[in-house]
Every structure is written in C-alpha cells, then in structure tokens.
C-alpha cells in the first residue's frame, strides 16, 4: 500500500511545527490535498466498471496513432498533457488538454459526463499512469486506461483491485498490458 511513518517529536518542537502548519484544504488538483494519511488518499470508487468490456488491438493502435493529431494546444506550446476518449473502434471522440495531467483528465471526465457517457471505449493519457489517474478513470466508469508512459506500482495494484485494464508504455504499435490482459483481443 505504501509507507507511513510515525515520528515522536519533542513538545516544544512540535508546537513550533504546528504553528507553521499550512492549510491542507485544497480546492483544485488531484484530490490529495487535505489527506493526512494513505487511507484517506486511497478512496474506493463507488462506481462499477464493465469488466466484460474488451478492446481490439487494432483499436488501441489506431487511437495511439491519431492522438497527436488531436492535440492543438500541444502543437502550439509543447507544454501540455492530453487525455482522450476513444470509442470501441479506436476513433478519438473527445480530447482535453492542460499543463497538468490530472486537470486534463478532470476536463475529459466533465466533458464526457455532459455528453452522456456510455462506457464503450477507453481513456488515453499522454502522461504516466499514477494511482490517482486510475482512481479517476474507475470513478468515471471506464474499464481501460492507456498511458503513453509508465504506470506506478500503486497504480498497477489499484487497477487490479478495481478491475481496470491498465496499459502503459503505449506508443503505436507497441504497448505493455499490466492488468487484465484477456481484455485486449488480437484481431
């Protein structure tokens, strides 16, 4: 799960530390602000995902090949992440960009919810796959997250726990399936 440290601090030093304590209440970001331990940070998603949904290898490759053409802000600035929703055929349906990978995913989730999300497809991110990205994808109700970069160990364990198919190092035509390999079918 992670490492949690318990440290004993002298009373006078503790009071000094307490006086300097910053406000942990966060209003934007990945959702970890205000969490003082790992259990608070690792909230279990309540949404159920379709563990029977599978995607074809050709759909993954098609979406990966098309992703860079949909990133208009990245083309102008070279400084943004993108998150995209691709349908079952691998056609990019929606893309959202932001300098923050979490913000890009939040924007995508909001746009999908407004449009009427049906769950038949997959999320692609141009970033690494952290457990927060896994958590948000599961909360959306999507059954697959594909990341251009590596997943973290906690992301892999969380994906296994939630039933999410997690794919990393995805650069067409190659990728690595970390969880639920049976959900990616050959053509």
Positions of predicted regions on the chain:
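Feature captures the catalytic cores and cofactor-binding loops of soluble hydro-lyases/lyases
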Residues: 101-180, 186
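Intrinsically disordered, low-complexity regions enriched in acidic/Ser/Thr/Pro/Gln residues
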Residues: 1-83, 88, 92-94
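Protease-associated
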Residues: 79-115
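Conserved active-site and cofactor/substrate-binding residues in soluble primary-metabolism enzymes
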Residues: 25-28, 33-36, 55-58, 62, ...
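Arginine residue identity/basic-tract feature
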Residues: 13, 21-22, 27, 43, ...
